[in-house]
């Protein structure tokens, strides 16, 4: 069973992503959520997340810093950034951190099939 963490400060985004993933991978995934970068980093490390769907702009600690903190302790964890920011700078930094993918919001149900190939 894959442990998936969805980190986004927007409750509707967290719920939508969780719903899409749960419908597509019902018996293959356990889902946890986090509403900010600090909680995402802590949850990912303590819970042992296998995969994180991470927003970039979140209060307190942004998603890039949260991913960096997680990957320092759990380098086997996979990170996919899901963000509204299409700036090359963000995508470049995300890939430099070792992100598996960089998806732009809104995420459509058809894009969730990419999650299966990312893990």
Model-derived regions: residue spans:
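Short hydrophobic/Thr-rich beta-strand motif most characteristic of the beta2 strand and flanking loop
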Residues: 25-35, 43, 91
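Switch/coupling loops of ABC transporter nucleotide-binding domains
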Residues: 2, 29, 77
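CheY-like receiver
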Residues: 41-114
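Amphipathic alpha1 helix at the N-terminus of the CheY-like receiver
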Residues: 12-26, 42
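Positively charged, low-complexity/disordered segments
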Residues: 115-119
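Conserved acidic segment of CheY-like receiver
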Residues: 2-13, 17, 33, 52
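Short helix-capping segments at alpha-helix termini
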Residues: 24-27, 73-75
């Amino acid at each position: 069973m894959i442990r998936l963490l969805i980190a986004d400060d927007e409750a509707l985004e967290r719920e939508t992503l969780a719903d899409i993933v749960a419908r597509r991978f019902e018996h293959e995934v356990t889902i946890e959520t986090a509403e900010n970068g600090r909680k995402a980093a802590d949850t990912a490390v303590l819970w042992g997340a296998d995969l994180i769907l991470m927003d970039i702009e979140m209060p307190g600690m942004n998603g890039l810093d949260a991913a960096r903190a997680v990957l320092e302790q759990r380098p086997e964890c996979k990170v996919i950034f899901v963000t509204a920011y299409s700036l090359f700078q963000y995508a470049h930094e995300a890939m430099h951190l070792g992100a598996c993918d960089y998806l732009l919001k809104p995420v459509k149900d058809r894009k969730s099939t990419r999650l299966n190939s990312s893990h």
